[in-house]
Amino acid sequence: ITAKVMAMCTGNVRRMEDMKLGFFAKHMAKFAGINSTGVGMHEPYKLQLVIDMVGLPRVLLAGFVSAVTRPFGVKGLFYKICGHGVAGIDGFYFRSSFDRYKTLALINPEHPVELSNEIEKECGIPIVIMDANDIDQNQLGKCDDFPLTDDQIQDAMKDNPSGQGGELTPLILIRPLA
């Protein structure tokens, strides 16, 4: 199951209209790197959400370290320093296939292993919660009885069968080939 579906099911959703955009988010976003995989910290509302989640001092430190190391080709330190699942924030996509998703941010579930076990207990189907895209596949949690190893799960998800962009496939069934 995609982490984004679980974010919606658990209420880990932030609405743009419920957020107050602050000075630092407005100004720091101008200096954030932009990539082709989605909306990053160059979106002021997304940066404000990070500030709300981890605090301004940590975001300022992460921004400073990123600015100093970027000229040397070091990337990703902002997300590592901020921690707390900041890389798992998804949303505020102005090019989204869903109009509502343009003003929503989804945050990965806080306790994915427990959530996986609860879903398995209720549905009788072993599940793994993934935050996957065309660049990386992040296994957030799996139920205790999941029949595959972590390596087998990563292998099954390496080409991102749920797709990216407009493909919007929230559930993937993994079964043996033979």
Question: Residues of each region from the PLM?
Answer:
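N-terminal and secondary-structure boundary signal
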Residues: I1-A178
